[in-house]
UniProtKB/Swiss-Prot annotation:
Extent of Basic and acidic residues compositional bias: 1-15
HAMAP family: ClpS (MF_00302)
Family note: Belongs to the ClpS family.
Subunit structure: Binds to the N-terminal domain of the chaperone ClpA.
Organism: Stenotrophomonas maltophilia (strain R551-3)
Gene3D superfamilies listed in its UniProt record: 3.30.1390.10
Listed name of the protein: ATP-dependent Clp protease adapter protein ClpS
Amino acid sequence: MPRESSPDSHHEHGVAVEPARPEVAPPPFYQVMLLNDDYTPMDFVVDVLQQFFTMDLDKATQVMLHVHTRGRGVCGVFTREVAETKVAQVNEYSRMNQHPLLCTMEKA
C-alpha cells in the first residue's frame, strides 16, 4: 500500500529535510571617535576614556596622546545603539563640565 504524505511532511524518500533558515547578517559596527581640541585638559580626556570606555590608566593615556597628536582617535567599536549612547554620554558629560571635547561615531 502506498504511503500517503501530507503537505506538512518534512520527509522526502525517507530522508529528513530541515526547513531552510534565512541567513541573518551581523549588525553593522561603528567606531566611536574622540576629536582633539585646544581647550580640553588631557586629564579630563583620560577620565572620559576610563569612565565611559572602561580603559585602564595606561590605555586611556595612550589613546588620549593619539587623539592629541593625530587630531582624533578610536575609543571603541560597538553596535549602532551602543555607539550612539556612548557618544551622547560623552558629549553631555563634556558640556556639563564646560569642556568642548567632541565625541562622534562612524561606520567601522
